[in-house]
Amino acid sequence: MKYDTVVIGAGLGGLMAALSAAERGKKTLVVSKGMGIITIFSGTIDILGYYPVQDSAPLSSPREGVERLIAEDPNHPYARVGLEALEEGMSFFQDAVAREGVTYVGSLDRNFLAPTAVGTVKPTAFLSKSMEAGDVREESDVLIAGFRGLKDFYPAYMAHNISTSRVSGISIPHFRGRILDVDIGADHSGMSALTLARKMEEDDMIQTVGRALFRQVRDGERVALPAVLGIRSGDDVFRRLEDMAGTRIFETPTLPPSVTGYRLYRALERRVRAAGIRLLIGYDVHDPEVARGRVGAVSISMGKKTKRIEGDAFVLATGGLVGRGVITDRKSTQEPIFGLPVTGPSKRSEWFTERFFDPAGHPINRIGLTVDDQLRPVDDTDKPVYKNLFACGAQLAGYDALREKSGGGVTIASGFKAGRLAGEL
């Protein structure tokens, strides 16, 4: 089989790359072992929450932070991608998911300060419309409403932690936690957020929860609910509940697996298929065929079944250490498909600093592929290993998504740009 663009990896970066290439009229394939960690992450899109990373105060403006970062760190993925591609990529992303019924709000000019299920405050630039009312800078108090039998969401615990949090320059409103008098049908082992989200698409459940909220909420309060307001969208369910409760409602992402991440993945998957992109999940990718500085084909296999896939351009979006796009053993760190050079500490003893909560982060979090301004992986002489192979997402070296709170922005921007560049070949 022959394609114009072959994207390896079906996470956020891979799907963005595929959509970007397809927009340029390219026959595109996405092939992956699995769905990527997008299905377990919070669903918020972090652009830049902290810079420098040692700062304890979150950035007010991601744009200003990115501009400064690009000027000071030319090896950071944002410097390779550029601010223009970040802006275009985020607009492209918002349009893609909106077409599938999932609305994302936000901008590069202002971070939200969103509460988390464990009671911390997280800076993030873009989030689902169903989370918009949760910014802790708003003065109105918050009722955290939970469900008896729902796993991993504890309103009293969240309320206590967030009410005692300290965020520089911010006065956090009062949070109180309550369990709603609603039978969700959980058995003795409890119910997952995904299961409850499916139930929340039923009219009877929406009516029951709406009435329970109306009885609990006080004048002037907002309501925080676990992110269980439907699998497909979330927008319609939360609007109906707002009407019934008579106040603003927002979702709070639960611990993994997260409904908001799953919802986002399904929206992107629908958009990918609508764009005519072929999506193959469950395949190993191996045995690349290379000649004269270019990748000509790869083999993909499921069990004993193997296929040869030719392509004019290839985008590698297999993730970092968590996604196994970079793997390690006791002696080395490798990129497993193409054998690309990996940038990072050569010794395991250098992966971590002595302080577990080191404000500067740990070197292992910056491991990945070094790329040029065209997002092509380079060798130790800074020359592209293959002229038609691009990389994006968590696989890139030189940034610490955990400390910077930059993972979503880097992934979307680099995926968008990699797909565009691949589509130009």
Range-by-range predicted roles:
Residues 1-79, 84-87, 95-425:
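Residues forming the flavin
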